[in-house]
Structure formats: structure tokens, C-alpha cells
Amino acid sequence: MLAPGMGEWVYKANLFLFGEFGYYYPFSLLILNYLYYKKKYKIENFKRRELFGFSLAFFSTLLLFSVFYREFGYILEIVYGFFSIILGRTGSGIFALLLLLFSLVLLFPKFAKEILKIELDFTYLLKVEQAFKSLLMRVFGGENEKEDVGKSEPIAPKLNILQDSIYGNLQINKKGETNNLEQIIKDSNINASKNSITTAKENFEKLKNQILDETIEIDKQSLKESRSFVHEHSQQVRNFAQKASKMSISLDEDFNFISEEEVDMIPERFLKPKKLEDIKQIDTNKNLDEPSYKRKNIEIPVSNQEVKPKIFTKELELRENLIKKEKLEQEYKAYQNEILENKVKQEIKKLEEYDAINSSDIIEGNKYSFNSPKTIKAETEESDKINENKNLDKADNIFEFAPIVEELNHPYIEPTPIKNINEIVIEEKNTLDFIQNTETKIDNEKTNDQEIKLQKAVLAKEIAINQALLREIEQGEVEKPKDFTLPPLDFLANPKEHKQEINESEIDKKIYNLLEKLRRFKIGGDVISTYVGPVVTTFEFRPSADVKVSRILNLQDDLTMALMAKSIRIQAPIPGKDVVGIEVPNDEIQTIYLREILQSEVFKNAKSPLTIALGKDIVGNAFVTDLKKLPHLLIAGTTGSGKSVGINSMLLSLLYRNSPKTLRLMMIDPKMLEFSIYNDIPHLLTPVITDPKKAVNALSNMVAEMERRYRLMADAKTKNIENYNEKMKELGGEELPFIVVIIDELADLMMTAGKDVEFYIGRLAQMARASGIHLIVATQRPSVDVVTGLIKANLPSRISYKVGQKIDSKVILDAMGAESLLGRGDCLFTPPGTSSIVRLHAPFASEFEIEKIVDFLKDQQSVEYDESFLKDQQSVGVTTNESFDGEVDELYEEAKRVILEDGKTSISYLQRRLKIGYNRSANIIEQLTQNGILSEPDAKGQREIL
């Protein structure tokens, strides 16, 4: 009951005193409470202008409320009554507003300066305040207290500013006192006579000097007060004074000159010890381990004991332990040597006694032979001398025959070849000399040997990766044709005998630039090996354990700039290794000739007739592959990338191993320029096809040929064309040749007859391998609409020359890198069944060389084309219907039902639905047209259902 009643009483008292102002001023208390919290609940932390500003703001607000609500509060009535008498109501309001503005300027001086363009001179306000105080002191009496002006900024004051303010205040006081003194003297001398003027002046000078002396004492006293004020209110200045006082103390054993105040001020840990033993202990234990501001700058008498530095304590302890361990090992080896020597001497003595008893030179069944006791003694003396001259560190090499001597204590074993001690001692000398010589040689050539071994190991490892692919090729001799002469290698140009000179300084410079650029991006590691090839130089960089491989891949452009290269390729990581391969083009690129590849042992020893030459790897070794194991090849590359050169090399390598009876070629060249040089060679199955419609017919007929071969092999009960041909040799039947279909530009065919071409290529790629039909498909634009998912899935082996974009490389290789190739035959090859990518450089064969080979083949045998592959299937269907004389196909009714139900009239659709050949499907469509079910084909080749 007390609390509610008291609250109501306070509420009424508040309304009685302040009226309407009582509803608003409590909110200002919230602001004051927050500011009081920020000042750490100390009124001393408030600046004087802030206190004046708060007070004036409160008073001006109270005055404004008294002007408007003078009848609602007792205090408001009193304030309004006082100011209305002096200023009136309007004047009181204006005065309150000006006072409120002045309080805001005091509280926010920077805001007032920037916005209101009002700036107060606080020194002038101090003078006004001092004058007002002196006036009050004169009126009401009392001493004129000199306030410490520095109190306006009590938090961490600066000593110089504080002193300046003190001296300024003192100068003001001096001037005020001298003015007062002059006024008193003038008042006292009004009634004086002219004779007393001189005495008054003397008295004035004495009083002035006395006042000056008092002011000097006041200056010193005020300075001490200011210092005490600084130490009391500033933690930073106190810490600085403590550290500075420590530095001012000099070495004195008694330390009697330090005042008690300074001793109390300095912490105990900063005081110097008074005993010499304590000083030594600090020097040995703490002086080197502690920070510099804790060290004692004193001179310590040098002791005889060596003071070990504590900075590398762990390293020194580890080193001492290693030295002790090494000494123990040496002592142990010396002790073991002494034991072995004693055992040998004892065994020799036993042998001497045994020899003296038996008096025979050679003991049967023993392992040693002795000439006489004299020779034994001489030999033992020689062995003792040798043992004395030997170093104890080489204990492992001393007395290698000692274990053999120990076997004398064992029972008799099978006889072994007899050895003389002379031979043993001589062998021991020779081994020691040999070991010493080899050790010196190894020490002198250690680094060179390591580099050579490392280089050979890395080179062998790189060759092993490529040879793992080459070993998959079947080795053997190729069966030479009997009635056909293969072209000689003389038609091909010889490679230049100029050997590539390895510029080691240039390679070292590239390694330095590479590592320096990587370190700039905080990537640590080292180049562990370097391969110099005909086109590129490969650096194997082993990154640190904390480096992500993706960071190195993202720096490809930066590394290209650092190495000043045209383009580089980063293989991260190299399969089977813990390194990243960085391939940089050489300054001088060598030309690789086709003759080099065809003369290589790898190509000669390959048994397969479909071995094709792909070029050289990054080391410079020849690289070939078997088309039967690919079994189809997809090639991509922009104009000028060397794609046509690579295809020509593959074709020539096939022509150098096969006669027209074992190999037939079908070339589709929509550009009409690439394969025109091969026209009329005996290996061609058809003329070079340049018309897209004929190309579709040729592919459809090739599918029919594939089906025909499968039926033949099924009748012969064989699984592939090799077994079928062997069986035909035994039976005297006709052998089937290999057929290689080469399409130079797939994109043009996909634009004219995309679905049909995709279907036929898919059929051939899926099933034609066993029948001896292989595809080599090339395109300049490996986009998704050209290299569709069906084609890409059925052509696992791919070669990519330089492409224009990263996405093209991703489409053809499923990996980046082809966009960074150099062109001119530089390519990436993906073997089937592996995820590794092999970088190759295609060989070059000029048009003049190709012409000589083509002419040589033409002169031996004329070409025999199979025109049935190029016939239009629709015309074939008409002729077959006429020849049938009204005979209807067995699937006629079913085909009619499919077309009427599905509404599709294309030959390829009917072929897929009925799973028949293209020719039969075309015949059925023609029969439906003749019977009036389908219309004739329009300009686009489409038919309508009638």
C-alpha cells in the first residue's frame, strides 16, 4: 500500500512543481543515464562544456515551457515571473531559444561548425568565466580559486597540452593581479603629494617583484599538481612513467638514491635486484628469453662458465644427442672390432697348433690351406699391421673373412674350394682400395649421377606409359601380297639430319620463371623432371601437400605470360603420378616426317594390316595404333590445325601395308578438295563421293554390305573376318577385304540428311567391327548438333587437333586441353578403354609425295569401282518392281499397316520399324506408290498418304 501511495504523491508533486514540463523532462533522464554509462559512471569524465550544455539545455527548455504553460506549475510561474519582468514574454521566449541553440553548440561543436557554421572560441569563454568569478569574489568575498583548466579533458590528457593550458591560465592570473595592484596603488596615491610619487613607484616595484616570486612558486606547485593529476587519471601515462623511471635508474649496489615515492610507483618486477647472485641468475635464466623492455641494461662481470644461447635450445640439445649417439656407435664398433680381432688370433693359434701336430700342409675337408707355420706367422703379422692401419669407422669392411673362420668350430660340412690366407689378405687390400676409390668418385660425381639416374628413370617411366599402349598391338610380320608391289619408302622425303640441341640455360630460365610465378600466388613445389621433345618441353611440377590442383589449372593464362609462350597446356594430374604436367612449346619446332614413323621398329613389327601412323609423342618416339582395336575413329580440328595432314598420314600408312585385295576404301569428301588426289587408285571401292545424297546412299549400301557379310560369316560359322578369311583360304573361297570408310566433313552431311546419316553411322559403328568395316569420321565443328550422343557413344576412340573453344574440347575429348594446342598436327589422342590422354604430333607428307605414291599405285593396277554403292535406291526400287512383274513383297501388307497407323512415309522409318535393309524398304515404298497408297515424292523428297 505504501508504494502506490508514494508514487501517486510523487506524481502530484511533479505536476505541482513543473506542470506540463513534468511529462517530458523524465525522457531526458534516459539520455543522461546512457551518457553516464558511457562515461563509466564518473562525473569527472564529463567535459565542462558538456555539463554546461546539459544544464543550459534543461534550463532553456524549462523557460520555454514556462512561457507557454506558466499557469500549470509552481516553478514555471516563478521562472516566468522573473524573466517576464526583465525581458517580457516575447523576449523570454527568444532568450530561451538562443540559450537552447547555445547549449546545442556546446554539446555538438563539430556539428554546429559543419552545418550551422558556428564556431565558439572556448579561450574567450574561459576568460569570461574567470572575469565573472573574480567579480563574484570581489562582491561576496573569499579566495579566487584557480581552477585547473585541464579538467575539461580528463581522459588520457597529453602532457604538453596540459602544461600549455596551465601556463596560459597562470598568465591570465598574473595580468589580473598586476592590474588589481596598479588599481590599488592608484587609489592609494590619489591624495598623495608630488613628493611621494617616487616612493610609491619604489613600493610598486617591490610589490611587483614579490608577486612575481609568488607566481613562480605557484607555477611549480601547479606543475606538480598537474603531474599528480595525470598519474591519477591516465593509465597510459602511468605505465609510461613506470617504464621510463626504470630506464633512469643506473647500476648502484645500494640503491639508496631512489626516493620512496618512486619506489612505491615502480612495480616490484621492474626493480633491480640488490645482490650480485640475483643479477647472475637473471642473466643466465631470463635475460635472453624475455622481451627487450624487461632486460636490465647493466654490465655483468664475465664468468668463466660459457653461457649458451637459449634461442636454439632444442636444436642444440638435438645436436648434442646426435653427437653422443655417434660417439657411442663408434665406441661400440671399436669394441666389436677388438672382439673380432681376438677371435681371429685365437683361431689362427689353434690352426698353428693343429698344423704342428699333423705336420701337413693341406688338411682335407677344411676350408683353408697353409704353407708352413713360418708363413702363417708372417701372414698374421701382416694382417695385424693391416688391422692397425685401418680406420675404426670402417668396421663393416674389416675382416670380412671372420665369419668364415668362425665356422671352424662347427662340425664338418661338405668340402668347399680351398683358400689361402694370402689370397684373403690380398682380396681384403684390393677391396679396401676399391672402396676408397669408389667413395671418392661417388663424392665427386654424386650430384651428376643423381641427375642422370633421375632423368633416365623419368624418361623410362614416360616411355612405359606410351609403350603400355604400343604393347597391345599384335607383333609379327605382315603378309606381303604376291601379285601386287607395295610402294617403297623412297617416295617419302628423308628427315633432316639436324639434331635438336638442348639449351639447358633456356630450360633453367623457364623453370625459374615458372616457379617464381607460382610462388607469387603462394603455390609451393618444385620441378622434378623435364622432357624435351620435338615440339614441346614438358615440366613435371610436384606441388606441396597443401596445394589444390584446381588452383594450378586456374593459373594457365598467368603461367603462359610468365613463360612468354604462345600457349601452354596443363595436365593435372598426370595419370599414375603425383605431379602436374606443364607443356610449353619450344622456340624451334621440328617437322616430323612420315618416313620417320614408317621406318620405326614399332611400325615395322606391327602384324595388323590396319596399323596407322599417328606421329610422335612428347619425348620424340614414334607412336602407332591398330585400327581394328579402335575400331572406329572420330577426329576434330579447326582449319589449319593439321587435321587433313593427319588423315593423309593415316591413309598413306594403310596404303603402304595393303593391296587392293586386302583393303578397300570409301572416301566421302563434301568439300571436294581433300581426297580428290586419291581418285582412281585401285583401293577405292567407289569414286571419291562429293554429293551428300550419294553419300547417304553409299552409307545405306554399306549397312547392307555389313548385313551381307554377317550372313556369310554366320553360314561359315566364324566370329570375325580374320577367321572367315582363314577358312576361305583352306576351302579356296573368296576372301573379304577390309573396308575403311573415311568421312572428311561430318557437319555438312548432318545439315543435309542429319537423321539418316546419324542412323547409318550408328549402325555401322555398333556392328561393323566384326565384319571388317571401320569408320574414320572427321569434322571441323565438334558441336553437340554434329557430334550427337549416338555418334559419340559408338566412336570411343577420338583424336582432337586444335579447336577454337573449351566447350568443343569438352565435347570431343570429355576434357579440356585441345584449345591450348599449337596447330600444325599437334593433337590429343584418347585410346579406347582408358581415360588417359596422349599428346602426339602428326607427321607431314607433302602433296608431291602423295602424288608419286598414287601414280605408283595406278601404274600397277587399274581401279574397279562397285557402282551399286552409289545407285539411287528409289530408282532401284522401280526397276526391281518392274522386274518382279507384279510380285509383291512379303512384308507389303505389314508395311502398309505401319504407314497408315503412324502416318510416316520415309524409307528410313519403315526400315527401322520392320528391321529390314534400305533397299528392301525402298522397294516396298515404291510398290505402295505404284498401287496408289502413297504419292510421288515432292521437291523435299516427302510423300503423302493418298
From Swiss-Prot:
GO cellular component: plasma membrane
Domain FtsK: 620-810
Biological-process GO terms, alphabetical: cell division; chromosome segregation
Gene3D superfamilies according to UniProt: 3.30.980.40, P-loop containing nucleotide triphosphate hydrolases, Winged helix-like DNA-binding domain superfamily/Winged helix DNA-binding domain
Keyword Cell inner membrane: yes
SMART domains linked to this entry: Ftsk_gamma
Cytoplasmic side: 113-946
UniProt membrane topology term: Multi-pass membrane protein
Residue spans crossing the bilayer: 15-35, 67-87, 92-112
Superkingdom of origin organism: Bacteria
InterPro entries on file: FtsK/SpoIIIE/SftA, FtsK_alpha, FtsK_dom, Ftsk_gamma, P-loop_NTPase, WH-like_DNA-bd_sf, WH_DNA-bd_sf
Compartment(s) of residence: Cell inner membrane
Keyword field: ATP-binding, Cell cycle, Cell division, Cell inner membrane, Cell membrane, Chromosome partition, DNA-binding, Membrane, Nucleotide-binding, Transmembrane, Transmembrane helix
MF GO annotations: ATP binding; DNA binding
CDD domains, per database record: TrwB_TraG_TraD_VirD4
First-listed, main subcellular location of the protein, grouped into a coarse class: membrane
Binding sites annotated in the UniProt record for ATP: 640-645
Classification via Pfam families: FtsK_alpha (PF17854), FtsK_gamma (PF09397), FtsK_SpoIIIE (PF01580)
Domain observations: Consists of an N-terminal domain, which is sufficient for the localization to the septal ring and is required for cell division, followed by a linker domain, and a C-terminal domain, which forms the translocation motor involved in chromosome segregation. The C-terminal domain can be further subdivided into alpha, beta and gamma subdomains. The alpha and beta subdomains multimerise to produce a hexameric ring, contain the nucleotide binding motif and form the DNA pump.
Function in brief: Essential cell division protein that coordinates cell division and chromosome segregation. The N-terminus is involved in assembly of the cell-division machinery. The C-terminus functions as a DNA motor that moves dsDNA in an ATP-dependent manner towards the dif recombination site, which is located within the replication terminus region. Translocation stops specifically at Xer-dif sites, where FtsK interacts with the Xer recombinase, allowing activation of chromosome unlinking by recombination. FtsK orienting polar sequences (KOPS) guide the direction of DNA translocation.
Subunit record text: Homohexamer. Forms a ring that surrounds DNA.
Record-stated family: Belongs to the FtsK/SpoIIIE/SftA family.
Protein name as it appears in the record: DNA translocase FtsK
Gene transcribed to yield this protein: ftsK
